[in-house]
Amino acid sequence: MKKLLLTLTMLALLGFLSACAWLEEPEIDYRAAMIEAAVHAEEAAGREAADLRNAVLDAQGSAEARIDFDELLLLSRALTLRAGEARLTDELRLCAGEVLLNRVASPEFPDTLREVLAEEGGYEGLDGVRPDRRSAETAWELLAGKRLLDRRVLYQSDGKPSGPVYATFCDRYYRYTYFCLTEHPELYEETLG
């Protein structure tokens, strides 16, 4: 009887362990992990999450955008510095970040976000900025491909417009922000469409 009871217990345990082995691993929310790492300036954790996410996307053959953690952190910091005020809308924050990414893609500006920010001049001390959550989430959306503006919008001004105005925002304190087009549209004619 003891042998039978022991055998049945072992079979039940073996069945339980086999069932556990077939359970799927829970999906990891790499987006949340990377945003959390950006907000807390945990660069090693953020890079690891980005590498894992991008490896999963590669293994799946996904067309989803690969997001570099260093770009996410840098853009998050720039958005916090330039558009991190709580009173600003998410839409305005998206547009501010989009101007920076449009510049990276433009033949009129340097080819990397860090170089664009260095040239801009208004981003001194950027590496010491701790991103806020809204800015990190906005940076993620932008790096994932979300766009609101024409890609020829290369300027943002809180004062007098610096070129042909594409969009105007007014915050609740009646401060206007203008998003302006390049003064060299001919550089973009071939690739528009």
Question: Where do the language-model regions lie?
Answer:
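Bacterial extracytoplasmic/cell-wall-associated proteins, especially those involved in peptidoglycan
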Residues: 54-193
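N-terminal secretory targeting signals
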Residues: 1-67, 183-193
